[in-house]
């Protein structure tokens, strides 16, 4: 018998709003509240909000916290010197495969926060504890299931958050992208997101999230589900763990070489040896379909250099054409013509640099 689905503190709000609920990594989550297309456009044109409380905030503290994180992840947290600053990184296994992709916040040398994906949370915690024990780091790893998280995204997102919580504006208005600030006791506002739009991700006590959700609703922020979240992140050129990368995929094969910091030779992060010895046979590219049809994950891609495969694909509501990500042979370049097999027919597609959409506007691809 399968385990019952986990529920976030906003589960009753979703049901009351008529959400279609689905199993997402063992969590009962909203797919859409009505029109997925309208939810997508709300984020691109105004403001939408997502329940992301299924994701896990993990506090990492102790005398060795910085050294531990420099060992644990491929990006170098030492570059974070200002409290509240954050970076994106992959956590690798010894073979260089991606265990998870994370956002890491710096507060003090002995005080950090790591945000991990819902479906990998238990695996991630176990791996963090294993690395800490193996190298004897003096760290405390504390999963924070007492916290909830709401992402408010779109060109009007910040203004609507401030309308709902005027007291938060002074601390959060100066934030640069990938920065966070405490706006009240126990509540963190970060200028981050997964949509390609401006906005905030708000981390707060679980018992306070329902009132925040209702107050944002009163300001005209539209609830959005996983369906719109997926089309938005695809347009924005953002990977989804478990679909675009996993433990068998190196960062270079997922378009994430920019998250691997190799400059400090003395920093031997987990997976570094494999990364340095690995000759990358595959590249990660964007594709834009040139005829009617919709690209989906696992469809074959035919290139002049050989065969590849789609990892993600959808119909782009902003562009009105199908877009996707593909792992293809090295040598495939933006501007190249390739073909995607859709229902037994080879359909032409254009290789593109990512993203497809930036701040609500189409990115030009020749």
UniProtKB/Swiss-Prot annotation:
This is Aminomethyltransferase. NCBIfam families: gcvT (TIGR00528), PRK00389.1 (NF001567). Its EC number is 2.1.2.10. GO terms for molecular function: aminomethyltransferase activity; transaminase activity. It comes from Bordetella parapertussis (strain 12822 / ATCC BAA-587 / NCTC 13253). One of its GO terms (cellular component) is glycine cleavage complex. It is an enzyme of class 2 (transferase). The glycine cleavage system is composed of four proteins: P, T, L and H. Belongs to the GcvT family. GO terms for biological process: glycine decarboxylation via glycine cleavage system. It catalyses: N(6)-[(R)-S(8)-aminomethyldihydrolipoyl]-L-lysyl-[protein] + (6S)-5,6,7,8-tetrahydrofolate = N(6)-[(R)-dihydrolipoyl]-L-lysyl-[protein] + (6R)-5,10-methylene-5,6,7,8-tetrahydrofolate + NH4(+). Keywords: Aminotransferase, Transferase. The glycine cleavage system catalyzes the degradation of glycine.
């Amino acid at each position: 018998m399968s385990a019952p689905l986990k529920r976030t503190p906003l589960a009753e709000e979703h049901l009351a709003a008529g959400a279609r609920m689905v199993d997402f990594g063992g969590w009962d989550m909203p797919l859409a509240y009505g029109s997925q297309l309208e939810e997508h456009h709300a984020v691109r044109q105004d403001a939408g909000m997502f329940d992301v409380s299924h994701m896990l905030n993990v506090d990492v503290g102790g005398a060795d916290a910085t050294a531990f994180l420099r060992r644990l992840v491929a990006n170098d947290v030492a570059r974070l010197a200002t409290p509240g600053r954050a970076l994106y990184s992959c956590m690798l296994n010894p073979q260089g495969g991606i265990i998870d992709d994370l956002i890491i916040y710096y507060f003090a040398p002995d005080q950090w926060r790591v945000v991990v994906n819902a479906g990998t949370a238990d695996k991630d915690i176990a791996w963090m504890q294993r690395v800490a024990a193996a190298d004897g780091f003096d760290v405390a790893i504390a999963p924070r299931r007492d916290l909830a998280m709401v992402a408010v995204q779109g060109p009007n997102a910040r203004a609507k958050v401030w309308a709902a919580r005027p007291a938060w504006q002074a601390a959060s208005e100066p934030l640069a992208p990938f920065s966070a600030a405490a706006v009240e006791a126990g509540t963190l506002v970060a200028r981050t997101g997964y949509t390609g739009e401006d906005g905030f991700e708000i981390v707060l006590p679980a018992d306070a999230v329902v009132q925040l959700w209702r107050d944002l609703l009163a300001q005209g922020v539209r609830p959005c589900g996983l369906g719109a979240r997926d089309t938005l992140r695809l347009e924005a050129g953002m990977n989804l763990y478990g679909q675009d990368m996993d433990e068998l995929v190196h960062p270079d094969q997922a378009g994430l070489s920019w998250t691997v910091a190799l400059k400090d030779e003395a920093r031997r992060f987990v997976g570094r040896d494999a990364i340095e010895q690995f000759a990358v046979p595959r590249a990660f590219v964007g594709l834009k379909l040139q005829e009617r049809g919709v690209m989906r994950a696992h469809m074959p891609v035919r290139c002049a250099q050989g065969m590849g495969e789609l990892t993600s694909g959808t119909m782009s509501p902003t562009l009105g054409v199908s877009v996707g990500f593909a792992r293809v042979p090295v040598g495939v370049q933006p501007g190249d013509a390739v073909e995607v097999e859709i229902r037994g027919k080879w359909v032409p597609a254009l290789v593109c640099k990512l993203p497809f959409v930036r701040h609500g506007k189409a990115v030009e691809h020749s």
